[in-house]
Amino acid sequence: MTDTGKPLLRVLQGEAVWPPPIWLMRQAGRYLPEFRALRDQADFITRCMTPDLATEITLQPIRRYAMDGAILFSDILILPWAMGQSLDFVAGKGPILGAIRSEADLARLDPKRVPDATAPVMETLSRLRAILDGPDPIGAAQGGRVTLLGFAGAPFTVACYMVEGHGSREFDATRGMAYSDPLLFDRLMATLTQATADMLVAQIDAGAEAVMLFDSWSGLLPPAQFRRHVIAPTRAIVQEIQARRPGVPVIGFPRLAGIMAAEYARETGLRVMALDTGADMAAMAGLLPPGMTVQGNLDPLLLLAGGDAMAQEARAIRDAMKGRPHVFNLGHGVVPPTPPEHVGDLVRTVREV
């Protein structure tokens, strides 16, 4: 076990801690008035790539709630942008990218650009680690108690946006390419797999104590494609991180994977499995490798609703995992209309002894 005063890091390393540590996906976001005040200062990419702004945004929920984890403020699409794919975030539409549909499109991507392009992200992580590990309180949080998390999009989910050129509910063009031009799609996935591993190692070197892979659209794939485009790339990334930076926990989040989630947990070599809202925590925990840390999985819409129902379900999830390494989180990200007071209520509920 890890000799550390950081509860989250202890649990990510496989130790059961009571009450469990808590952090939330999208804990730094539009539901916070202090985030909205900064949002008008710069566009989204500029906020991600400006260390002063990204550091401040990352720390906002730490100051307010003393979360046990601080996750880097960035975006899963920073990687394709860093490789040279055009990217813009359009109000009301979301991300717009220059779609990858041919060998010529793929050839324009240059993974060698990534270290220089993402240098501001690494500077943000370095600053955050110094602040979090320093002696001074960070608002409501004690210095030396908060774990710094890096992250990336998993290759399939990032490929969805790169091929489609925008967000979608089904990503038909992406899934179609995987069937109709498997060689091209495999080359894209291979490029993303190596670039993702390299970027996560760089994040670790810059200060991240654990990293998370978000595979938000993995649930779109049937089992054979899931094994090929979700499990295999994730396993390769985890193996690369373990070989280059042994002992650093990797959290996997195969959203909406359903019955494939257990196979994903067994076959990827991950230390931590994040479960989405649809998973029965206790039942799924019984299908996972012994001692594997579980993260999740309160419904974000129940957090939005708040009140006794939220508190009751939060206690039920927490109590069902007692005695097992468990990180309390949501089953997806905080939704923008969530009252900040509800997040505070949740944190207090989870930390009840």
Swiss-Prot record:
Catalytic activity as recorded in UniProt:
uroporphyrinogen III + 4 H(+) = coproporphyrinogen III + 4 CO2
The catalytic activity of this protein is classed by the Enzyme Commission as 4.1.1.37
Question: Which GO molecular function terms does the record list?
Answer: uroporphyrinogen decarboxylase activity
The metabolic or biological pathway listed in the UniProt record of this protein is: Porphyrin-containing compound metabolism; protoporphyrin-IX biosynthesis; coproporphyrinogen-III from 5-aminolevulinate: step 4/4
Which Cys-Cys disulfides exist here?
none
Q: Which InterPro entries match?
A: UROD/MetE-like_sf (IPR038071), Uroporphyrinogen_deCO2ase_HemE (IPR006361), Uroporphyrinogen_deCOase (IPR000257)
Instruction: Write out the GO biological process terms.
Output: protoporphyrinogen IX biosynthetic process from glutamate
* Site residues (Transition state stabilizer), renumbered to this chain: 75
Residues bound to substrate are 26-30, 75, 161, 216, 332
The subcellular localization recorded is: Cytoplasm
Recorded GO CC terms: cytosol
Keyword annotations from UniProtKB, A to Z: Cytoplasm, Decarboxylase, Lyase, Porphyrin biosynthesis
Indicate the family of this protein: Belongs to the uroporphyrinogen decarboxylase family.
What does this protein do, in the record's words? Catalyzes the decarboxylation of four acetate groups of uroporphyrinogen-III to yield coproporphyrinogen-III.
**Self-association and partners:** Homodimer.
Q: What is this protein called?
A: Uroporphyrinogen decarboxylase
The gene that this protein is the product of is hemE
